From Swiss-Prot:
Motif segment (PTAP/PSAP motif): 88-91
Subunit annotation: Interacts with protein NP; this interaction probably directs the encapsidated genome to budding sites. Interacts (via RING domain) with polymerase L; this interaction inhibits viral transcription and replication, Z partially blocks the product exit tunnel for the releasing nascent RNA product. Interacts with the glycoprotein complex; this interaction plays a role in virion budding. Interacts with host eIF4E; this interaction results in eIF4E reduced affinity for its substrate, the 5'-m7 G cap structure.
An annotated Gene Ontology molecular function: RNA binding
Protein name, per record: RING finger protein Z
Keywords assigned by UniProt, alphabetized: Host cell membrane, Host cytoplasm, Host membrane, Host-virus interaction, Lipoprotein, Membrane, Metal-binding, Myristate, Viral budding, Viral budding via the host ESCRT complexes, Viral release from host cell, Virion, Zinc, Zinc-finger
Organism of provenance: Tamiami mammarenavirus (isolate Rat/United States/W 10777/1964)
Membrane topology value: Lipid-anchor
Gene: Z
Length: 95
């Protein structure tokens, strides 16, 4: 299911990355000062999206996009196009 879209994007854009896509990370590495957390709710530490100088989770991003196109924390434009850094995996399909 996910491979079809990836192949279409690859055929359309070649090997270069599509422009305007923000990477979504499944797991963030530990830093010197601890874990990365969502700057809005402070609970989520997986599936974070980088805004201008901080990270926000998908739930907070969706709720902010329902209200306005700008981030309530930093005032920058919120990311709308996402791409996965690692391709999600699924069990093999057997009809």
């Amino acid at each position: 299911m996910g491979l079809r879209y990836s192949k279409e994007v690859r055929d359309r854009h070649g090997d270069k990355d599509p422009e305007g896509r923000i990477p979504i990370t499944q797991t963030m590495p530990q830093t010197l000062y601890g874990r990365y957390n969502c700057k809005s709710c402070w609970f989520a530490n997986k599936g974070l999206i980088k805004c201008s100088n901080h990270y926000i989770c998908l739930r907070c991003l969706t709720s902010m996009l329902n209200r306005t196109d700008y981030c309530e924390i930093c005032g920058e434009v919120l990311p709308k196009r996402l791409t996965f850094e690692t391709t999600p995996t699924a069990p093999p399909y057997t009809p």
